[in-house]
């Protein structure tokens, strides 16, 4: 009984992971969503390899929160690191 419960939980987690990982990233299709706005002028180069967004929900008084939506194969706070662990990078033609 315990083994079947564990198998069901593992199957559920795997299906959830597959469904979530296949969802488009918010902002990927030109839609930033209700809590994200384009960054103001002057922040065009804030993200090294990505797009700057103003995350309104994370703002503190007098301190706006800016974040990056990284280009494919880039990771990090400002998209400055090439993710060589992504096998798709080596298959890119």
Swiss-Prot record:
GO terms for cellular component: extracellular region. Keywords: Disulfide bond, EGF-like domain, Neurotoxin, Secreted, Signal, Toxin. The keyword rRNA-binding does not apply. Expressed by the venom gland. It is found in: Secreted. Residues 43-80 form the EGF-like domain. The keyword RNA-binding does not apply. One of its GO terms (molecular function) is toxin activity. Disulfide bonds join 39-52, 47-68, 70-79. Residues 1-30 form the signal peptide. Ant peptide with probable defensive activity which acts as a potent agonist of the mammalian epidermal growth factor receptor (EGFR). Mimics, both structurally and functionally, vertebrate epidermal growth factor (EGF) peptide hormones. In vivo, intraplantar injection in mice causes long-lasting (several days) hypersensitivity of the injected paw to both mechanical and thermal stimuli. Its long-lasting effect is unusual for venom toxins whose effects are usually immediate. Belongs to the EGF domain peptide family. This is OMEGA-ectatommitoxin(02)-Rm1c.
């Amino acid at each position: 009984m315990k083994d079947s419960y564990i198998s069901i939980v593992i199957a559920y987690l795997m299906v959830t992971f597959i469904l979530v990982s296949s969802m488009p990233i918010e902002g990927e299709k030109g839609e930033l969503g209700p809590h994200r706005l384009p960054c103001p002028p002057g922040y065009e180069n804030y993200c090294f390899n990505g797009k700057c967004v103003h995350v309104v929900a994370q703002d503190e008084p007098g301190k706006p929160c800016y974040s990056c939506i990284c280009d494919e194969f880039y990771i990090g706070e400002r998209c400055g690191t090439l993710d060589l662990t992504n096998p798709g990078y080596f298959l890119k033609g």
